[in-house]
């Protein structure tokens, strides 16, 4: 059996840990010796008596993944973000999970037994064409977006707003995400910064509804405004990237970068090993909550 899997980089344990990588816990220690791929192949054979070979590859962005699929790349299981899951559901790309997938009485239903209640609730409540995300997807990771910054060069106040991406003080010293969803979200936050941070807006009784409306405005005028803004920001940014900002921050090539929270933690941990402090700020205007989940392609 060949199982073709496409996932984000650094989303699974690939094994071969050194002694320096050991995680010490009160109950013992953790050291990854085997790749989770090898462990899964062995586990599958032990439980089902069949040999499975995992062909594992990584994606750079959701848009890159979608283009790969439309060009004919063939996978069995992929791990896109929620907005791409919704698109794939709407376009009938996906197989639903089995009827007993969430049955906690089944011994091997580890997901149903261990899934975060927050993720389960989110995937149950959000729907496309009347069907919940959980009918097709198993939530895997979630997080927020924000700004990783060097506190020796950037103040917390400067990093706590989306307008940092067009701040000329940091010209060619800041990175921005190279994907449609995240770059446009940051642009909207920057363009509408004054309004989103105003007391009258924040204290309005329907704040959440108004915020969602502002951040999801797809009117032609707003989209044109976003495109113009991002074109101008290109002259201020060091790069539009998907993964290189982690290294660029650690090596000091840039002083701030727009990052997903998981990458932010990794970046700060790596910098800390070199006695180099980096911080993470969530923009005051609002932030982007994301979910990545496993789905099966037809």
Regions found by a protein language model. Give the residues of each.
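Extracytoplasmic/periplasmic substrate-recognition and gating elements
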Residues: 271-298
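Early extracytoplasmic/lumenal segment of secretory-pathway proteins
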Residues: 1-87, 91
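Hinge/lid segment of periplasmic solute-binding proteins
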Residues: 51, 55-66, 83-142, 156-163
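Short helix-loop capping/hinge motifs at secondary-structure junctions, enriched
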Residues: 152-160, 192-202
């Amino acid at each position: 059996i060949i199982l073709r899997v496409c996932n984000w980089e650094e989303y699974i344990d690939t094994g071969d840990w050194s002694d320096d990588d050991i995680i010490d816990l009160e109950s013992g220690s953790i050291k990854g010796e085997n790749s989770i791929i090898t462990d899964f192949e062995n586990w599958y054979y032990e439980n089902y008596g069949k040999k499975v070979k995992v062909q594992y590859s990584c994606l750079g962005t959701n848009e890159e993944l979608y283009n790969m699929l439309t060009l004919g790349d063939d996978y069995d299981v992929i791990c896109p973000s929620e907005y791409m899951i919704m698109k794939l559901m709407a376009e009938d790309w996906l197989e639903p999970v089995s009827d007993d997938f969430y049955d906690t009485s089944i011994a091997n239903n580890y997901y149903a037994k261990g899934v975060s209640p927050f993720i389960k609730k989110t995937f149950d409540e959000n729907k496309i064409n009347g069907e919940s995300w959980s009918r097709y997807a198993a939530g895997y990771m979630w997080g927020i977006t924000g700004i990783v910054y060097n506190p020796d060069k950037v103040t917390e106040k400067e990093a706590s707003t989306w307008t940092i991406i067009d701040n000329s003080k940091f010209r060619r010293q800041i990175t921005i995400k190279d994907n449609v969803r995240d770059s446009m979200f940051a642009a909207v936050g920057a363009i509408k910064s004054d309004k989103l941070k105003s007391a009258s807006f924040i204290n309005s009784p329907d704040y959440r509804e108004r915020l969602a409306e502002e951040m999801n405005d797809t009117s032609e005028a707003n989209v044109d405004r976003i495109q113009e803004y991002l074109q101008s920001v290109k002259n201020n940014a060091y790069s539009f990237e998907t993964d290189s900002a982690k290294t660029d921050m650690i090596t000091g090539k840039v002083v701030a970068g727009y990052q997903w929270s998981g990458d932010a933690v990794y970046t700060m941990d790596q910098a800390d090993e070199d006695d180099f402090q980096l911080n993470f700020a969530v923009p005051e205007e609002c932030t982007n909550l994301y979910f990545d989940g496993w789905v099966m392609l037809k």
